Amino acid sequence: SLHMAALIGLLDGYARDPAGGGEPLSDFAKTSLPAALRTRENLFSVLAFDDSLGALPVGLINCVEGFSTFACKPLVNVHDVVVVTSHRGQRIAQKMLVLVEQIARGRGACKLTLEVLSGNLAAATLYRRIGFANYQLDPTMGHAQFMQKWL
């Protein structure tokens, strides 16, 4: 479909960017992702198109619904945020995040979460401007750090 092709193309562009790791999506990911996304009800995506350029895909947000045990409610993790270089600075990400928040509220989510690289100052500035903050419970314990372990 047009939307899935846009999603794969935008995600591949993001993966190739230094903020996305600097490597293209694997052939496996490109061919398997459409079916994998369709089978997971806890995932949703928001796409942005520039209709003045013939419905050119210019933005993508992929989200994963999780669960807050403390609140006993769903939460939505904003997993990928992509805006093509030619369209940055036009508040496309902000508009997509407004829609993500509406969808999350519709799902009964208690909060949105996301990770941002410390060197991605433009993204961090946007996120703070629209209400995101570093995660912490007790200020004396500091804020959370995002960690990973490859399997």
Language-model regions: role of each:
Residues 108-151:
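C-terminal "cap" of GNAT-fold acetyltransferases
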Residues 1-73, 79, 97-99, 103, ...:
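Acetyl-CoA-dependent GNAT
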Residues 79, 84, 117:
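Residue-level recognition of the GNAT/N-acetyltransferase active site
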Residues 66-68, 86, 119-121:
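Short coil/turn motifs at secondary-structure junctions
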Residues 74, 90, 106-110:
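Short coil/turn segments at alpha/beta junctions that flank glycine-rich nucleotide-binding fingerprints
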